[in-house]
């Protein structure tokens, strides 16, 4: 019996998209300091940058709200091993809050739920900022990604539900007034991991007796990294391949605040095999007990180790150094 004849209608349709050759991705190691625009999620920004750089492996170092702009460090290849260190790092922001109005979300996207007269002056604002410097307790906002019973808080909020949240200790390392054009107040804050600048603005507004919400947020620093060497997606898109690669910083840009240890050839080989190195066999290491250090041979980053119990113990190794 002959097999049935196929017709043009039976054949799978081909399109320009299906015929387009796939662009090969490449292994790329380094850090891209991206100046994220307002309106784009951190994940979408990562996807665009990864596509422009034709990179195989990439990740970001903690989300920046779509309504916020500014510094978003992106890690490629071996740099992804050290992204956790930036998650733990202090952050610096410039923010503008509007006094006299509270919103459902704590920012300009939410519905105004409370309006009060603004009866304070610049001196009162400056005094309030001083009160919020140092260790403070924050109650996380309902419109946040924190989870309760496996569900983000913002899902409860969108359903009109309020979930009880416990206050958390955070540290405001610096809080400076940049402009006071009431009812708008612009400030710069350097804060510990887990600080909600929206909540900080709301709490300052309550301390001033008029409430407040955030109208602008721009991140200018993550640990030792700053916007000074950041690139926008538009600039990255307009650049040629060589110029795009030039924006990549080396992996150890993430580790610049770690004490430095340099090993001889023999010790470097042992380190790359995951062996602990007795401190007695090494040059003195300027690091406290239990402190993490960045480890190099004569020219290359080998990884990160911890100085503890008389040894230098490898924790993260750079594969490309092996």
Curated annotation (Swiss-Prot):
It comes from the Bacteria. Residues 1-22 are annotated as: Disordered. One of its GO terms (molecular function) is RNA binding. Residues 1-11 have a biased composition (Basic and acidic residues). One of its GO terms (biological process) is tRNA pseudouridine synthesis. The keyword Isomerase applies. Responsible for synthesis of pseudouridine from uracil-55 in the psi GC loop of transfer RNAs. This is tRNA pseudouridine synthase B. It comes from Burkholderia lata (strain ATCC 17760 / DSM 23089 / LMG 22485 / NCIMB 9086 / R18194 / 383). The lineage of its organism: Bacteria, Pseudomonadati, Pseudomonadota, Betaproteobacteria, Burkholderiales. The gene is truB.
């Amino acid at each position: 019996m002959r097999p049935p004849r196929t017709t043009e209608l039976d054949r799978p349709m081909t399109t320009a998209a299906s015929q387009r050759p796939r662009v090969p991705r490449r292994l790329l190691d380094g850090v891209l300091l991206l100046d994220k625009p307002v309106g784009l999620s951190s994940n979408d920004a990562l996807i665009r940058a990864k596509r422009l750089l034709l990179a195989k492996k990439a990740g970001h170092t903690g989300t920046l709200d779509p309504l916020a702009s500014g510094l978003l460090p992106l890690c490629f290849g071996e740099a992804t091993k050290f992204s956790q260190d930036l998650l733990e790092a202090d952050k610096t922001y410039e923010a503008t809050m509007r006094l006299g109005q509270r919103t459902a979300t704590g920012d300009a996207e939410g519905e105004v739920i409370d309006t009060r007269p603004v009866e304070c002056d610049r001196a009162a604002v400056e005094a309030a900022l001083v009160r919020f410097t140092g260790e403070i307790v924050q109650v996380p906002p309902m419109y946040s990604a924190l989870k309760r019973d496996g569900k983000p808080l913002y899902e409860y909020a969108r359903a009109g539900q309020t979930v009880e949240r416990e206050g958390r200790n955070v540290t405001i390392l610096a809080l400076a007034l940049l402009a006071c054009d009431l009812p708008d107040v612009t400030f710069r804050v350097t804060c510990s991991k887990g600080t909600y600048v929206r909540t900080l603005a709301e709490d300052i507004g309550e301390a001033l007796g008029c409430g407040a919400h955030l109208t602008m947020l721009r991140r200018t620093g993550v640990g030792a990294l700053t916007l000074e060497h950041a690139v926008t997606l538009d600039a990255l898109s307009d650049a040629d391949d060589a110029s795009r690669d030039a924006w990549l910083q080396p992996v150890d840009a993430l580790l610049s605040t770690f004490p430095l240890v340099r090993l001889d050839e023999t010790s470097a080989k042992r380190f790359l095999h995951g062996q602990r190195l007795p401190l007695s066999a090494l040059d003195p290491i300027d690091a406290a007990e239990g402190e993490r250090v960045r480890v190099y041979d004569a020219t290359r980053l080998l990884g990160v180790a911890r100085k503890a119990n008389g040894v230098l113990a490898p924790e993260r190794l750079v594969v490309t150094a092996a």
